[in-house]
Amino acid sequence: MIEIIEVQAREILDSRGNPTVEVDVTLSGGATGRAAVPSGASTGTREALELRDTRKKRYLGKGVEKAVENVNTLIGPVLYGMPADEQFMVDSTMIGLDGTANKSKLGANAILGVSMAVARAAADAYELPLYRYLGGIHAKHLPMPMMNIVNGGAHAANSLDIQEFMIIPVGGKTIAECVRMGAEVFHTLKKLLKAKGFATAVGDEGGFAPDLESNEAAIGFIMEAIKKAGYRPGRDVGIALDAAASEFYEKGKYVLKGEGKKLSSKQMVDYYENLIDKYPILSIEDGLAEQDWDNWVMMTDRLGNTTQIVGDDVFVTNPAIFEKGIREGLANSILIKLNQIGTVSETLQAIDMAKQAGYTTVISHRSGETEDAFIADLAVGVNGGQIKTGSLSRSDRIAKYNQLIRIEEALGAGAVLSNDFTAVVR
């Protein structure tokens, strides 16, 4: 009663008003699953390919009609009759049907939509919540949230070069308490920015996008907001950065246009080291560019003993690339994005590799999101440790936090909040 009998895709809009793919899967016993695919703004060059129509007169070239057609006419018929609880078989079949290294024939957005919807349909068939279906009896750890409250870089039209300034409510004992702490700091920050005459409009991921004079000024505002909200920086609430350094890497130099600086790889690491010495920065993501592979080892050696060094663009959730990074000592954490690799199975493989190698994992959204909260269930199902899903505003971000609160309630006394961080006081 779990055979796939119908696969139906459609074009919907994401949180930026751009088209994306949504897929419904129906099984022989009547179970159903629905999934919507996210989309990134700052993307790694080796990510699985998101198929767009490129017809400029329709959605300015960003339509996904071809990806939808591929699901409805090519992928669906091949999967009919296949058991939905054989996720690896389903995903391998789609990968084989595509036949390219980066899923460019059918589109990673087409393949991922089906992969996620199949997992949901199988969970429905077994009458299990998605997190329980994915993780079995071991699914009980809620992820520590990284909350992006100041946006810069490709996520905002301001002078900040660093893309995300996040808070981590390390002093929280439950996910509900973490969400409350984050919301209180977020709203306190809004008042502080407004009092200083800065705009409080939000960026793609729900964080504020003030036009500040430097990256350090943004950290200063966050420090003040933490204190004014009644929390201790480092002990109660830490700070994390996503530099997205590939976005400002030009001809072998890191060009911080907002600060008028042009830095070598070593100087860029010096820059981070100075910030870490002054502030409770617990995690730095994509501190160097994906093209600057060799210097990632240097950065990890210098900063990795005290700071989580997260690889996003440098690994793109790709098990083959990640395996090389593990072997060479790059980073000590990996960002996990479903649409970077394009199937649930390959995502689970990357997470398993990280755990075996002693890397932490951060389950992540994209800047273009929908109301789909799949990653919340995924984070709990795989005991992911951390989740990065935006600020404490915009319903596309809040949907994930709310789902985590529901899961925590369902787990009851068995729920455990993960905390990969040691309290840091600076």
Curated annotation (Swiss-Prot):
It is an enzyme of class 4 (lyase). The keyword Cytoplasm applies. It catalyses: (2R)-2-phosphoglycerate = phosphoenolpyruvate + H2O. GO terms for molecular function: magnesium ion binding; phosphopyruvate hydratase activity. Its main location: cytoplasm. Pathway: Carbohydrate degradation; glycolysis; pyruvate from D-glyceraldehyde 3-phosphate: step 4/5. GO terms for biological process: glycolytic process. One of its GO terms (cellular component) is extracellular region. Catalyzes the reversible conversion of 2-phosphoglycerate (2-PG) into phosphoenolpyruvate (PEP). It is essential for the degradation of carbohydrates via glycolysis. This is Enolase. It comes from Desulfosudis oleivorans (strain DSM 6200 / JCM 39069 / Hxd3). The gene is eno.
